[in-house]
């Protein structure tokens, strides 16, 4: 039957990508339908019960700055919070949280059910409705047809998923859930470039059978407890719990080696490539044979369960080998396994067949987000889902697509890497992937993106008002510090010596003093008995005040570096965003080698910047391409008309501070 209501956007899948996509589309005012095979698993954490980490936490903050749900749900469900790299520079500091699976999922479900313009429907999707070169809807397994102007596919590991435990295997999207076999077949019929990838998960352990007295305790940060969302509050957090640390040993490694003849990875049963940066324990033992021990983190799954996640022993070895290797580790000698570990193979589609909006180049209105694009991780999925949801909504509302640039957001880095370079293994985000990471910090994600989000229609009034209060306070106080001066006459020598190590010898602004190593905002404001501080409090709220002070300190201390990077961005941006015509035939570009023209015709980059990052496309080839465009008057700046955030001033030094 044809459902009587037509939607603007249909989102297929209710994981981290799908929920962010549906929420974003609905926030923009698009009539949105979220189709999931099981409403009870919306927002489910299928693997590790954690959010964030190096690079990943940056993505979560960006999703939050654009009005997304992941950070807020983590604040409601987080049972341990830590700031990683806290002793290092601000560019690489990152938030990580352990989450109670149930509380996190409950928060996501509540956000979905309370979101205007969003409908939920429980049915697996078996088919897409395609007319010519555009998608017009989706068909469920019982034949219900839903029509829409755009469809976002966020199928995770469900596309023709196959689960492996030892040499036994069976179809499944994850443990306990069916695979999307029919949908996978339909996508293959559409001739989209496709491959197979693999990921895995460790066995889960009953905490009542763990001897914690033999383990090293790893508490979270407690003074203060961090928050993930820019609107988050520490009092939102439930009870905080520690994690625990144990290690593998030579006996563990011998047990693993003895089982490799029954490993689906090492007997050729699994053909998909696994994640390099989250390898299985058997892969670790094989690749790092010289190491006699690996650290294993025992992470609580929640407040109302005894289940623990042993982070570091993802495996597809036979269950008897899993049991033996767990029992070989200190503190786990009597451990009971609640669920076996397994590997899962699944279909993904080459992201080079996508536009930077995450719309497929071949089928108008069809968007992909998450693991279907070859990524791994909740955070990468959520970020893609948010972007796909925004652009599906804009497509349905007949507005121009939007994607942040590499110098605007880690989300921009993620998408650009995917659509220009593709993947040969599951892709995960690191700070090292971003060339402008000093400007792309966790702490300034809102300064970079919230105004753009407001233009896009995904940032509500509450977030917008809070953002403006913070931005205005940072701006006013930074200006005050730059225009307030102290001299040898007005700053007593003993006070200057206490703060700076010696008296000052000429006039300094407070900003110049703050720029010195080891000098804090509070230290500068405390000079002359506090007279150098602001005349009235920057904020009544202690958490907001801390965020404002952090922004001010980083902006002033790193001003020179930030301005230098802004200059580099401006120089590189001269040609970076020059759009390439849709119908250009690269074999007609004089001087291009056959190999380069073939690659450009195959991957169809949208901009000169994207073309320059395709493997094998040389700087000389880019120069020839620029000459070709100039002669024919074809190139124009991407987003030079009305795309939100297109103005280069979005990334000025002032904005980055």
Curated annotation (Swiss-Prot):
Subunit structure: Homodimer. Heterotetramer of two MnmE and two MnmG subunits.
Subcellular compartments: Cytoplasm
GO cellular component, one term: cytosol
Source species, domain of life: Bacteria
Annotated segments matching region Disordered: 635-657
Binding-site positions, NAD(+): 274-288
Organism of provenance: Burkholderia thailandensis (strain ATCC 700388 / DSM 13276 / CCUG 48851 / CIP 106301 / E264)
Disulfide bonds: none
Binding site for FAD: 13-18
Annotated protein name in UniProt: tRNA uridine 5-carboxymethylaminomethyl modification enzyme MnmG
Transmembrane segments: none
Alphabetical keyword list: Cytoplasm, FAD, Flavoprotein, NAD, tRNA processing
GO BP annotation list: tRNA methylation; tRNA wobble uridine modification
Listed SUPFAM superfamilies: FAD/NAD(P)-binding domain
Family membership: Belongs to the MnmG family.
First and last residue of the signal peptide: none
Entry annotated with the keyword Flavoprotein: yes
InterPro entries in alphabetical order: FAD/NAD-bd_sf (IPR036188), GIDA_C_N (IPR049312), MnmG (IPR004416), MnmG-rel (IPR002218), MnmG-rel_CS (IPR020595), MnmG_C (IPR026904), MnmG_C_subdom (IPR047001), MnmG_C_subdom_sf (IPR044920)
């Amino acid at each position: 039957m044809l459902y009587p209501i037509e939607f603007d956007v249909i989102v297929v899948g209710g994981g981290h990508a799908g929920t962010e996509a549906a929420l974003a589309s609905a926030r923009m005012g698009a009539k949105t339908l979220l189709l999931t095979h099981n409403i009870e698993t919306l927002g489910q954490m299928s693997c590790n019960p954690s959010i964030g980490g190096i690079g990943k936490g940056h993505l979560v903050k960006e999703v939050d700055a654009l009005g997304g749900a992941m950070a807020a749900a983590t604040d409601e469900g987080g049972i341990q919070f830590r700031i990683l790299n806290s002793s290092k520079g601000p560019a690489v500091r990152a938030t990580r949280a352990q989450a109670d699976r149930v509380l996190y999922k409950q928060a996501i479900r509540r956000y979905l059910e309370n979101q205007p313009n969003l409908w939920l429907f429980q049915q697996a999707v078996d088919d897409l409705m395609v007319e010519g070169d555009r998608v017009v809807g989706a068909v469920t397994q019982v034949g219900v047809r839903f029509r829409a102007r755009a469809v976002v596919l966020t199928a995770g590991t469900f596309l023709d998923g196959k689960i492996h435990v030892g040499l036994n295997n069976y179809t499944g999207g994850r443990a306990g859930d069916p695979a999307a076999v029919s949908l996978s077949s339909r996508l293959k019929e559409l001739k989209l470039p496709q491959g197979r990838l693999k990921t895995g998960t460790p066995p889960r352990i009953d905490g009542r059978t763990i001897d914690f007295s033999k383990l090293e305790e790893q508490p979270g940060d407690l003074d203060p407890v961090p928050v993930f969302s820019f609107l988050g509050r520490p009092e939102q957090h439930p009870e905080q719990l520690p994690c625990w640390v144990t290690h593998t040993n030579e006996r563990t490694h011998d047990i693993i080696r003895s089982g490799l003849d029954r490993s689906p990875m090492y007997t050729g049963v699994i053909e998909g490539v696994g994640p390099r940066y989250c390898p299985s324990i058997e892969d670790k033992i094989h690749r790092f044979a010289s190491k006699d021990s690996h650290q294993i983190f025992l992470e609580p799954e929640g407040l109302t369960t005894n289940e623990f996640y042993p982070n570091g022993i993802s495996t597809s070895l036979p269950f008897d080998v899993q049991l033996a290797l767990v029992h070989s580790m200190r503190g786990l000698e009597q451990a009971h396994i609640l669920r076996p570990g397994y590997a899962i193979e699944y279909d993904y589609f080459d992201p080079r067949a996508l536009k930077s909006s995450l719309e497929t180049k071949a089928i108008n209105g069809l968007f992909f987000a998450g693991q279907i694009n070859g990524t791994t991780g909740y955070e990468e999925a959520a970020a893609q889902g948010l972007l796909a949801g925004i652009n599906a909504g804009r497509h349905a509302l007949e507005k121009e697509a939007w994607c942040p640039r590499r110098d605007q957001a880690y989300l921009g880095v993620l998408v650009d890497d995917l659509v220009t370079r593709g993947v040969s293994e599951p892709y995960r985000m690191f700070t090292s992937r971003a060339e402008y990471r000093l400007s792309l910090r966790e702490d300034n994600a809102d300064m970079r993106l919230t105004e753009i989000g407001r233009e896009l229609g995904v940032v509500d009034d509450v977030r917008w008002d809070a953002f403006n209060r913070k931005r205005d306070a940072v701006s006013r106080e930074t200006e005050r510090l730059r225009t307030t001066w102290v001299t040898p006459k007005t700053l007593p020598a003993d006070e200057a010596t206490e703060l700076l190590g010696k008296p000052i010898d000429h006039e300094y602004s407070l900003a110049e003093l703050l720029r010195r190593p080891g000098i804090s905002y509070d230290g500068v404001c405390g000079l002359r008995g506090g007279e150098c501080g602001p005349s009235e409090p920057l904020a009544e709220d202690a958490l907001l005040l801390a965020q404002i002070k952090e922004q001010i300190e980083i902006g002033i201390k790193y001003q020179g570096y930030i301005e230098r990077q802004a200059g580099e961005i401006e120089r590189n941006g001269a040609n970076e965003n020059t759009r390439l015509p849709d119908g250009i035939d690269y074999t007609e570009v004089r001087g291009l080698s056959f190999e380069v023209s073939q690659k450009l015709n195959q991957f169809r980059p949208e901009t000169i910047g994207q073309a320059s990052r395709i493997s094998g496309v040389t700087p000389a080839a880019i120069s020839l391409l620029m000459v070709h465009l100039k002669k024919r008057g074809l190139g124009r700046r991407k987003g030079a008309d009305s795309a939100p955030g297109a103005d280069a001033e979005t990334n000025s030094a002032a904005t980055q501070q």
